[in-house]
Amino acid sequence: MATTMTRVSVGVVLFVLLVSLVAVSAARSGPDDVIKLPSQASRFFRPAENDDDSNSGTRWAVLVAGSSGYWNYRHQADICHAYQLLRKGGLKEENIVVFMYDDIANNYENPRPGTIINSPHGKDVYQGVPKDYTGDDVNVDNLFAVILGDKTAVKGGSGKVVDSGPNDHIFIFYSDHGGPGVLGMPTSPYLYANDLNDVLKKKHALGTYKSLVFYLEACESGSIFEGLLPEGLNIYATTASNAEESSWGTYCPGEEPSPPPEYETCLGDLYSVAWMEDSGMHNLQTETLHQQYELVKRRTAPVGYSYGSHVMQYGDVGISKDNLDLYMGTNPANDNFTFADANSLKPPSRVTNQRDADLVHFWEKYRKAPEGSARKTEAQKQVLEAMSHRLHIDNSVILVGKILFGISRGPEVLNKVRSAGQPLVDDWNCLKNQVRAFERHCGSLSQYGIKHMRSFANICNAGIQMEQMEEAASQACTTLPTGPWSSLNRGFSA
C-alpha cells in the first residue's frame, strides 16, 4: 500500500509541476485574450523580379536543424520536410545543403524506426535526405563556411557549400530553439545574431547571389535581425516571432490534430508547418513571398485564439514581391492549384510553447510507461532533472541581478526591453563574455536558459564590468552544477 501511495504521490507532483508549463489551452477565448497583430508599414522599395534573366540563376538552399535529442524531434522533421518540398520543386540535391544532428530517425524512442513525419497523417520525410553535416559537424563554423561558399574552411561533413554566383537565388531555413539575440546549436558555441548578420554582409560583399530569403523558426527570432539586418543587401527575412516572445510547437500529444498515439513528442513547429503546408499545395509560380508571409502570419496568430506569435519581416521587404518558385521551385503536380487569399488549413485548437515541448515528451513518456518499468523511472528522472535545471537557472539569473543592481532594481534592469528597431545589445563581445562568466559558476544555460539572454544584454548595456559579473556569479552559485547541465560537459554557449 505504501509503495502504491508513493507512486501516486510522485505522479501527482510531476503533474502539478508540468500542468502550468505544457500545452496551452486553445479553446476560443474572449476579446481580451486575442493577440493583436502590429500594423506594419509596407516597405516595397524594390521592384519585382520581372527582368528576363530573373530565373536564369541557380536556386540554392541551406536547411538547418539546430538541436538534438528526441524531445526536439520537430526541428529535424521540419528540415526533412523542407528538403522534400524543395526537391519536388525541382532543386537539385547538389544545390541543397542539410544540417541536422541525425539522432531522431533511428532513435530507440522513435516508434517508426528509420522514418520521420512532420504531421499526424504525413508521409515519411526522412528517406533520401542527404547527410551533409551531422553530429558534431553541425556547428557555427561549418554553417558560416557553407553560406560563404568557403570549401577550405569546412571541417568534416560532405564538404558541400553554397558555391553560388551573382545571378543565383538562395533560400535559408533554420528551425531550432532561440533566445534574445541567439539561436541554439547541438554543439557549442551557439549562433549569435551579430555573427550571423556579419556573415550575411560578407556574402553580399562577395557578390555571389542576386537575392537571399531567410525563414527562421525560433523563440524571440525577431531579435536575430531587428536593428541588425540593414536594407540594401538584397536579403529578405521572416521570423516565427518578434524579438520578445516564444514561438510554438504543434501536432503535439493532447492537441487537435494530435500525432499518432504511439508518438510522445511534437511533430512540427507552427510557423514552419504553416509555410510548408502552404507551399506543398499551391503552384508557387502564382504565389509571392508576401502572400505567403500574410497567410503564415494569420495561421501563426489566429484571430480569436489565446495562443500565437507575431510573424515578422526584415531587410529588403520589396523582395517579397517575388514569386516563391524563384527560391523553392514548384511541384508540377500543383500546376492547377493557384494561390487563393485564404488559408484552407485550419489553425490547431492547441499548441505548445517551444520551451516546454521537452516537458511534454517527458510527461507523456512517464504517463504511458508501465508501473515499475525502467522506462517510467527514466522518464521520472528526466522530468525532475529538467525542472530542477530550470529552477536553478531562473533563480541564479534573478540573484545575479539583485547582487549587481539591488533587490528592488535588479528585476527591472534585467527585464528591460529596448524600443523597436534597436539591437539587443551595444557590445556583443561583452554579452558573450558575461554569458561565459555566468556559465563558469552556474552551469550551462542550455536550450531553456537562453531565454535569459536579454538579462545578460542589459547587464552589458548598464556598463557592468567583467570583474563585477564574475563576483556576482560566484556569489549566486557557490557550487558548479554537475551532471547533464554542467558547463564542463556541455561547453559554453558563447
From Swiss-Prot:
PANTHER family xrefs: HEMOGLOBINASE FAMILY MEMBER (PTHR12000), VACUOLAR-PROCESSING ENZYME GAMMA-ISOZYME (PTHR12000:SF50)
Site residues by UniProt (Required for post-translational maturation and enzyme activity): 266
Provide one Gene Ontology biological process annotation.
response to wounding
Family from the record: Belongs to the peptidase C13 family.
Enzyme active site: 177, 219 (nucleophile)
Q: How is it modified after translation?
A: Auto-catalytic activation.
Protein's UniProt keywords contain Nucleotide-binding: no
Disulfide links within the chain: 252-266, 430-460, 442-477
Please state, per the UniProt record, what induces or represses the expression of this protein: By senescence, wounding, jasmonic acid (JA), ethylene and salicylic acid (SA).
Annotated catalysed reactions: Hydrolysis of proteins and small molecule substrates at -Asn-|-Xaa- bonds
GO molecular function per UniProt: cysteine-type endopeptidase activity; endopeptidase activity
Q: What is the protein name for this chain? A: Vacuolar-processing enzyme gamma-isozyme
Q: Which domain of life is it from?
A: Eukaryota
Q: In which tissues is it expressed?
A: Specific to vegetative organs, especially in senescent tissues. Also expressed in seeds and root tips.
EC primary class: hydrolase
For this UniProt entry, which residues form the secretion signal?
Answer: 1-29
Origin species: Arabidopsis thaliana (Mouse-ear cress)
**Enzyme nomenclature, EC number:** 3.4.22.34
Q: What happens when the gene is disrupted?
A: No macroscopic phenotype, probably due to functional redundancy. In plants lacking all vacuolar-processing enzyme isozymes (e.g. alpha, beta, gamma and delta) shift of storage protein accumulation from normally processed polypeptides to a finite number of prominent alternatively processed polypeptides cleaved at sites other than the conserved Asn residues targeted by VPE.
Can you quote a single GO CC term? protein storage vacuole
